[in-house]
Amino acid sequence: MPMVPFIALPLAAMALGLVLVVLHLRGIRKPLLIGLHLLLGLGALEVLVVLLKGAPGSDGLPAGDFGNVAAGFLALAAFIGLLTPILGRRSRLTGNAMLLAHVSAGVAGVLLCIAWASSL
């Protein structure tokens, strides 16, 4: 499997997330962009899992430490991102803290994906 989609999907999700943060700071909410960010992030996680575990009938790539940890961080970012609109309505501080945790886990996952891809 080529590495281009594996690197392009998380970077595209991260770039769109940066746009969404700027819009959030301006008080603008774009549900279509949020949905696209969700699809790109879950697509990146899916490609990573397929690379780690292998497609049906094939073997996966050697995961090493970076691959498994990257999958964990991306899964954590997806989980926090899905919970943020639900739990973040309680207070602005809670929403911003969850958004910071989502961004931190996502950036760590993307950087570990790149590190893992460069070590293959």
Task: Please place each PLM-identified region on the residue numbering.
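Membrane-embedded alpha-helical bundles that constitute the cytochrome b-like, heme-associated redox core
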Residues: 1-120
